[in-house]
């Protein structure tokens, strides 16, 4: 029994010891698995960290390479691959000014008109008339301006634009800003980023084509065509009245469009004057052109000296001018700025789905810039006088803190043009002798300047202002387009004192301590008072 007992106990103990060993082995295996799992987790985490670091490095390298590739594409590939199409003249607009300011006529250009215009232009060219209005170089020399096809390239750009920059809002806003500029400054517009198609101003052919469109606006029109009145003003336009676009009472613009009407270019005509060669004949709109030039680009109504006849009655005394009067004169319904706004609205109504660009030469370029500023659309100008002062006087909207690269107004010019550079002033200048007070030099937007004085040895001369000289001898001749950069800080008419109202106050509302009421502003189109007499020094001695 002892043996049996010992044997049973041994077997039972063995079973217990075996179970314990197995449990130990199991625990050891489980512990090993946990350690292996921890090791695998750590390795996986390290691998992910390494991948993240590598991904970040690749992203940085890719971003740098992509930025360079994008810049190359914008300057090379985009220029070749963003063809906006072939543009032709599709409409001619005439807007009356002065007593005829309610007239707005539109001529739709068709095949019959092109044929008649080509025949008349050939006669003009044969007799040497208007030969300075159309470029003479290359394939354009024998081209018919009314049938010429222009090549433009576009690119999509991000611009800053207000939601309110539409005709329904802007004109009432400008009228309100004219009467109460202090309150208008408190109106906060909803500025935001917007993608739109703009002209590719790095492409040489595009810049030349826009300059040609500006030149086309000068070319004489035949006295025929089916003009239609697009205003509510009831008038009959018959016979010789059809050629209103060429008399002294109007502003003209030519409208160009591509094949699918997705892009439309509005080219505004510039100044016609014999003293400005290459800008039209002296009897074509010259009187009102000169008046609007002196309003837009002088410090105070073209008051250069007591010998000058002013174009408005805002001058008070030596180097003192009534600012509210100047603003009212610019906003009058019979001035060119209002005519430009009406033309843009009509083009927008007839081409509602198109991207609208503006261009022009000289006065036409300045007007194109002002209209573009009003509605937040692109404009490319050529040899335009400084229009920044007019932009401020008209209270045109400017986005706060606008980055320079987002501006869509480009001014092309060269250093030998005294009008573009703002040096055509002074008693002995050609502009002053001809009665033009071109006293401004500051431009808004970007300036694209060809330094022909240093590059080509040109001398500053008014003859270099003409459009076909710019196209034939500069835009065509230079290998690359001039770089467009923001202009330096500039101030026009710094020595003038501008008072808000004629009695010297700066606010249209009377203050609490005022001893007499402040004059209220008059409606646009009429100054607050009229000077009836001045003394020898130019001081106004009697008011109407």
Swiss-Prot record:
Glycans are attached at residues 200, 229, 234. The chain crosses the membrane at residues 46-66. Residues 67-544 are lumenal. Residues 508-530 are annotated as: Disordered. It catalyses: a triacylglycerol + H2O = a diacylglycerol + a fatty acid + H(+). Residues 1-45 are cytoplasmic. GO terms for biological process: multivesicular body membrane disassembly; neutral lipid catabolic process; pexophagy; phosphatidylserine catabolic process; piecemeal microautophagy of the nucleus; vacuolar protein processing. Belongs to the AB hydrolase superfamily. Lipase family. PANTHER family: LIPASE ATG15-RELATED. This is Putative lipase ATG15. The lineage of its organism: Eukaryota, Fungi, Dikarya, Ascomycota, Saccharomycotina.
């Amino acid at each position: 029994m002892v043996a049996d007992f010992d044997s049973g106990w041994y077997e039972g103990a063995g079973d217990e010891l075996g179970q314990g060993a197995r449990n130990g082995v199991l625990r050891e295996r489980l512990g090993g698995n946990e350690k292996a799992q921890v090791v695998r987790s750590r390795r996986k985490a390290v691998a992910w960290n390494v991948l993240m670091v590598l991904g970040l490095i690749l992203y940085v390298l890719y971003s740098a390479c992509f930025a360079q590739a994008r810049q190359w594409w914008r300057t090379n590939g985009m220029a070749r691959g963003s063809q906006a199409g072939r543009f032709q003249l599709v409409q001619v607009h005439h807007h009356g000014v002065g007593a005829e300011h309610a007239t707005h006529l539109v001529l739709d250009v068709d095949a019959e008109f092109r044929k008649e215009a080509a025949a008349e232009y050939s006669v003009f060219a044969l007799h040497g008339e208007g030969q300075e209005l159309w470029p003479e170089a290359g394939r354009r020399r024998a081209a018919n301006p009314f049938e010429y096809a222009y090549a433009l390239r576009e690119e999509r750009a991000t611009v800053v634009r207000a939601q309110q920059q539409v005709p329904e809002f802007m004109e009432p806003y400008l009228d309100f800003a004219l009467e109460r500029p202090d309150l208008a400054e408190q109106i906060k517009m909803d500025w935001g980023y917007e993608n739109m198609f703009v002209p590719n101003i790095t492409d040489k052919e595009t810049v030349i084509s826009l300059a040609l469109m500006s030149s086309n606006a000068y070319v004489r029109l035949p006295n025929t065509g089916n003009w239609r009145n697009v205003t509510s003003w009831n008038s009959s336009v018959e016979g010789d009245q059809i050629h209103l676009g060429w008399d002294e009472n109007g502003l003209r613009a030519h409208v160009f469009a591509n094949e699918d009407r997705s892009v439309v270019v509005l080219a505004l005509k510039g100044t016609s004057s014999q003293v400005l060669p290459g800008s039209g004949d002296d009897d074509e709109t010259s009187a009102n052109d000169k008046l609007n030039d002196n309003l837009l680009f002088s410090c105070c109504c073209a008051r250069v000296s007591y010998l000058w006849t002013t174009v408005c009655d805002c001058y008070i005394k030596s180097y003192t001018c009534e600012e509210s009067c100047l603003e009212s004169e610019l906003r009058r319904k019979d001035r060119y700025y209002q005519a430009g706004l009406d033309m843009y609205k009509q083009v927008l109504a007839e081409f509602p789905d198109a991207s609208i660009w503006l261009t022009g030469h000289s006065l036409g370029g300045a007007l194109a810039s002002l209209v573009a500023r009003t509605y937040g659309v692109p404009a490319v100008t050529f040899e335009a006088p400084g229009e920044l002062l007019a932009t401020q006087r008209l209270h045109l909207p400017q986005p706060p803190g606008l980055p320079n690269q987002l501006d869509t107004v480009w001014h092309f010019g060269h250093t030998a043009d005294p009008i573009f550079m703002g040096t055509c002033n002074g008693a002995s200048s050609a502009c002053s002798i001809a009665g033009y007070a071109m006293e401004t030099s500051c431009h808004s937007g970007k300036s694209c300047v060809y330094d022909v004085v240093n590059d080509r040895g040109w001398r500053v001369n008014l003859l270099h202002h003409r459009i076909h000289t710019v196209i034939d001898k500069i835009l065509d001749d230079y290998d690359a387009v001039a770089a467009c950069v923001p202009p330096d800080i500039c101030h026009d008419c710094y020595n003038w004192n501008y008072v808000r109202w004629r009695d010297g106050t700066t606010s249209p509302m009377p203050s609490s301590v005022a001893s007499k009421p402040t004059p209220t502003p008059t409606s646009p189109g009429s100054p607050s008072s009229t000077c009836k007499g001045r003394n020898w020094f130019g001081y106004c001695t009697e008011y109407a």
